[in-house]
């Protein structure tokens, strides 16, 4: 599968750059554009943005590889267990996550304020904030919105202590341990700066969780009752 979209060339940084841009992106000589809007590549050299400027990009929305790694160690009763999880070789189109519809302000996220273009934030990874129609320049399907979603997540971590045999014997237990546990503690991803979860882009982010667990087992004896 492929995506059909325009090839983005970054964001306009000044009105002068827009005035000198050779490609008419809005059919009005770029009169509706402003600094912070997406600029596109003129593929056929006719200076007009049309279907001839579309390119085909491989739809890699499913990972090429999913992986996990479990590690564990123990020493004199102390133990640690770690699990890492990740995926490589896939991308997602995040346009719909940024361009909210009218009446959808509940989808307004932190990154709409912290990583959108402003004169004081010219290196932002998202366009300027504005009210826009469905055919707005920044809502066109383009490579600008295709983002790398490779990630590595610290899925679980457990740190604990297991009582030693001598202590267990005094307490008449077969085993006992206590551990600090955490899930989804850290995620390394290029989307992290935007506050997006690569595994849950269109849903509620996977939450961190913490807890303390204790487990103990006593000596058990099995009894059988004979019926005559």
Describe each PLM feature range:
Residues 1-13, 20-26, 30-33, 87-178, ...:
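Extracytoplasmic gating/loop element in the C-terminal half of outer-membrane beta-barrel translocons
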Residues 27, 31, 42-53:
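Acidic, glycine-anchored loop motifs typical of Ca2+
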Residues 65-67, 76-78, 150, 172-176, ...:
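Outer-envelope beta-barrel architecture signal
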Residues 68-70, 156-160, 211-213:
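Membrane-embedded beta-strand positions in outer-membrane beta-barrel channels/transporters
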Residues 73-75, 84-86, 161-165, 214-216:
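Residue-level signature of outer-membrane beta-barrel architecture
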Residues 82, 178-180, 214:
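Membrane-embedded beta-strand positions of outer-membrane beta-barrel proteins
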Residues 93-99, 190-197:
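Outer-membrane beta-barrel translocator domains and adjoining extracellular loop/strand segments
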Residues 218-225:
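Conserved small/polar residues in nucleotide/adenosyl-binding loops
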